[in-house]
Amino acid sequence: MKIMRIIRDYQFVKSSDKGASVAVGNFDGVHLGHQHVIDIARLWGIKNKSPLGVLTFEPHPRSYFSPHASSFRLMSSDAKATRLNKLNVEKLYELNFNKTLSSLTPFDFADQVISKGLGLRHLVVGEDFCFGKGRSGTVKEDRKSVV
């Protein structure tokens, strides 16, 4: 099994870590639904000869916005990374969910983080995925912004 690379800063990404086919989400628990999204990204990666990646956030956005709420997480960041490595994910983009990231509009997230920063080739998301400030970006918006 190859060792998965973990990338934590979208502003300083090596060219060798760009161009991945990526499943995007929090993947807490890495359950069968998550694995299905990852498998779709894997198939796109095979088709396009690009590495398989997962883009996730730490801390979980819910924890960031409600730091005093009771813990709801099924697994730690380290446990998630271990599980993703066992699924042969080649690159884990684990971004620090902070004020800067949480303030980006959907367009700016797609432009600054996905396109210019991480240089991702293809994104796969679950149908309930939202992104950008106030969760205002949807999958439909994502397609318009990134393509």
Predicted regions located by residue number:
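Nucleotidyltransferase catalytic core that binds NTPs
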Residues: 1-147
